[in-house]
Amino acid sequence: MAIEASVDRATGAIRVHRVACAHDCGLVVNPGMVRAQIEGSIVQTLSRTLFEEVAFDRARVTSVDWQRYPILTFPDAPQILIDLVHRPHDPPLGAGEAAATTVPAALANAVFDATGARL
């Protein structure tokens, strides 16, 4: 996975422009659905990594509504390029969740590339 991002030096805001993902899931039975699973996993993980937070006080969760809960919105979603590694002689493997594991590391590398600083 590779991510292209920029960082606003004044605010520290990170903007992800493009994500490229090569994904090996063995026999690809339904390529369109596999791509949709991977795209959803990437967008959800970018949102968790960049914005999402459950806030607490001393006694309870204070994040109680979705209106103020920060998530990645459609206008902020990056272009996502997916290359499926099709291995027709192998059994089908997982498609969606595996893409999530590499997003935070690829994002950290993109921030390093943009700023020269490690998170």
Predicted regions and their residues:
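C-terminal catalytic domains of large/alpha subunits in multi-subunit enzymes
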Residues: 1-119
